[in-house]
C-alpha cells in the first residue's frame, strides 16, 4: 500500500480528488487499483475498509460463518460504540470542550466510555484477542482507539483505565505488534 497524507489544515479532504474517493470528506479512504474484476475500487469508512482487505487477503476475518459474524459484530461495536464515544470524549476533554464551564457533556462521554471499556474487559477475560486465539479485524479496529483514548486524548485517568486489566493486557500485546509500531509512524515522522 501507499499512504497519502490528507491535511484538514490544507482542506485536502474537500478536494475533488478526495471527494471522488469519499463523498463524506473524512479519512480514511482507500483506492484499490486492482479491485474486483481488476478495476479500481474506492472505499471509505473505517470498518468497511478492513472487511474488504480481510476478504481480499484471506486474513484476519474468519471464514466459518458464526465466527465471521461474531467478528463483524465486534467491528460494529467499535463503529457505534467505542469509536464515537472515545472521539466525543476527546473533543470535550482535550479540545474545544475543555474550556466549557459545563462539564456534563464531558462527564457523559467519560461515563459511557467507561461502560464500553467494561464490556470489552468482561469479553476479554481469558482471551488473547477479541476472538479468542485469533487476531482479527476486530482487534485492528478496537485497539487503536484505546491508544487514542489514553495517549492522544490523555483521558485514561478520566475513564479509570487502570481498572480494566483485560483491556490493558490485550492492548499491551496489540501495541507490541510490529504492524502497529509501523502504523504509529505513518506518515513518516522520522524523516
Positions of PLM-derived features:
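Positions that flank functional sites
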Residues: 8-9, 135, 189-190
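GST-like domain detector, emphasizing the conserved glutathione-binding G-site
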Residues: 1-107, 114
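Residue-level recognition of oxygen-bearing side chains
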Residues: 48, 166, 179
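Structured helix-beta-strand junction loops
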Residues: 24, 56, 126-127, 177
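GST-like fold's C-terminal all-alpha helical module
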Residues: 74, 78-176
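Carbohydrate-binding/catalytic loop surfaces
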Residues: 95, 188-191
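Exported/periplasmic ABC-transporter solute-binding proteins
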Residues: 182-187
Amino acid at each position: 500500500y501507499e499512504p497519502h497524507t490528507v491535511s484538514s489544515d490544507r482542506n485536502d479532504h474537500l478536494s475533488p480528488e478526495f471527494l471522488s474517493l469519499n463523498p463524506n470528506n473524512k479519512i480514511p479512504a482507500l483506492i484499490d487499483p486492482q479491485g474486483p474484476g481488476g478495476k479500481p475500487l474506492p472505499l471509505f469508512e473505517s470498518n468497511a475498509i478492513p472487511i474488504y482487505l480481510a476478504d481480499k487477503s484471506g486474513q484476519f476475518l474468519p471464514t466459518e460463518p458464526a465466527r465471521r459474524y461474531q467478528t463483524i459484530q465486534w467491528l460494529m461495536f467499535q463503529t457505534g460504540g467505542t469509536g464515537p464515544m472515545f472521539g466525543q470524549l476527546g473533543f470535550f476533554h482535550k479540545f474545544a470542550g475543555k474550556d466549557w464551564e459545563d462539564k456534563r457533556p464531558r462527564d457523559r462521554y467519560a461515563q459511557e466510555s467507561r461502560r464500553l471499556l467494561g464490556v470489552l474487559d468482561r469479553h476479554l477475560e481469558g482471551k488473547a484477542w477479541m476472538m479468542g486465539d485469533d487476531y482479527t479485524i476486530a482487534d485492528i479496529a478496537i485497539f487503536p482507539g484505546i491508544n487514542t483514548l489514553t495517549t492522544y486524548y490523555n483521558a485514561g485517568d478520566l475513564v479509570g483505565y487502570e481498572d480494566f486489566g483485560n483491556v490493558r493486557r490485550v492492548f499491551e500485546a496489540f501495541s507490541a505488534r510490529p504492524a502497529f509500531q509501523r502504523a504509529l509512524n505513518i506518515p513518516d515522522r522520522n524523516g
